[in-house]
Amino acid sequence: YLFTVAVASFMCISCTKTQTTLSENEKTVNPPIMGWSSWNAFRVDISEDIIKHQADLMVKKGLKDAGYHYVNVDDGYFGKRDDNGIMHTHEQRFPNGMKPIADYVHGLGMKAGLYTDAGNSTCGSMWDNDAAGVGAGIYGHEPQDAQLYFGDWGFDFIKIDYCGGDVLGLNEKERYTSIRNSIDKVNKDVSINICRWAFPGTWAKDAATSWRISGDINAHWGSLRYVVGKNLYLSAYAGNGHYNDMDMMVIGFRNDSKVGGQGLTPTEEEAHFGLWCIMSSPL
């Protein structure tokens, strides 16, 4: 654990640096988002009941009061697009559609998140053989999907993956900027996460509130060390309202194939949590 101690010491020393003057923007603190996402635990096997139950538990267990305000529905809610290109939700998993999900989460005093891909198809369609994700990406449907997700359904956050975009060889900056512009026309307060599995570049600050800096995390110590190492020299690119995303946390998993690893020891989990906090990653 010398690696953990060394990194923690370095970051804590860095955190002691203070500024004597603050701009008006800096006086408004916009910390990294904190919440729950369905992907690690369920992948595409999600449902209306699962999401609502998780939201209830976040309130009951005190997570909401601790600042975990986002309930994010990841890949798996898609049904199909109709002849007009309108996205419909999965009839079995979400028979009542997605607006009731957002309304339910909002009713508990929290915010609701959603998922899409910058290309034609989602990661779940490729890695989990979820046929419903084929053609479900936002590519070619930006204004239409933005209105549906954030205007009609009322969601507050979106994770934008890149499996479909990568397959098509699309330009990342152009794609994410186009999506950002379409969302802004509906709701400028939507929080956007770029999930591109590497630091995208300085342009990301204008397109998103957070961005992944590495490949997917797995539930073993070597994977955590890799992610921390990737993020160690990226602190200059993060700041108030714009953060390096070290990926969803893998605490509580034991020998679970969905998160690829044997799981972390309690001490490793503590280090995991602490490092994500020290490095200002979304939780």
Regions from the PLM with identified roles:
Residues 1-21:
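Bacterial Sec-dependent N-terminal signal peptides
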Residues 141, 189-283:
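Glycan-recognition surfaces
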Residues 38-46, 88-91, 165-166, 264:
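Second-shell loop/turn segments in exported
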Residues 39-41, 76, 117-121, 163-165, ...:
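Active-site beta-loop-alpha junctions enriched in small/polar residues
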Residues 28, 32-38, 67-74, 111-116, ...:
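Structural recognition of the beta-strand scaffold that forms the well-ordered cores
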Residues 19-52, 57, 148, 190-191:
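N-terminal module-boundary/linker segments of secreted carbohydrate-active enzymes
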Residues 156-157, 163-190, 194-198:
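Extracytoplasmic, non-cytosolic globular domains
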Residues 54, 58-169:
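Aromatic-lined carbohydrate-binding/catalytic grooves of carbohydrate-active enzymes
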